[in-house]
């Protein structure tokens, strides 16, 4: 491949005479750092506070009135029963999953609180909580805890593809966007 723009000797000499007396510039080696806020521990503290706030609603003594016949289900008073029907049919697919296998009741409450806080923060409407079968401790307690939380609109036993009777699909009330 040949050089398209080759210069003859006269043109090179003319160029060299035209640039005489100029100094070579040094490269500017200063790198500009972007102005950012330090993230620090604020998000970690906020996440911990959300988790504590969300688990505050879970009491072991309170026994809400849940239907004992048929699959595990609940709909908050004032919420649409049609939403519960859509949960049962599997019309909603969960975006977040929580597996409670192997956790103690205290750990399960904290993780459940963190899940509900994450759902509100990330604007997730449907989540799946897998409590498993085990000794039926978490299987019995999880619906009782969920029914106490004010952000839970409804829950229903999950369809087979999401865990069947070892899991619950949960609908979470999202914050209404402010018009300010």
Swiss-Prot record:
Keywords: Endonuclease, Hydrolase, Nuclease, RNA-binding, rRNA-binding. NCBIfam families: PRK04946.1 (NF003432). It comes from the Bacteria. Pfam families: Smr. This is Ribosome rescue factor SmrB. Associates with collided ribosomes, but not with correctly translating polysomes. Acts as a ribosome collision sensor. Detects stalled/collided disomes (pairs of ribosomes where the leading ribosome is stalled and a second ribosome has collided with it) and endonucleolytically cleaves mRNA at the 5' boundary of the stalled ribosome. Stalled/collided disomes form a new interface (primarily via the 30S subunits) that binds SmrB. Cleaved mRNA becomes available for tmRNA ligation, leading to ribosomal subunit dissociation and rescue of stalled ribosomes. The gene is smrB. PROSITE patterns: SMR. InterPro entries: Smr_dom, Smr_dom_sf, SmrB-like. Its EC number is 3.1.-.-. HAMAP family: SmrB. One of its GO terms (molecular function) is rRNA binding. It comes from Pectobacterium atrosepticum (strain SCRI 1043 / ATCC BAA-672) (Erwinia carotovora subsp. atroseptica).
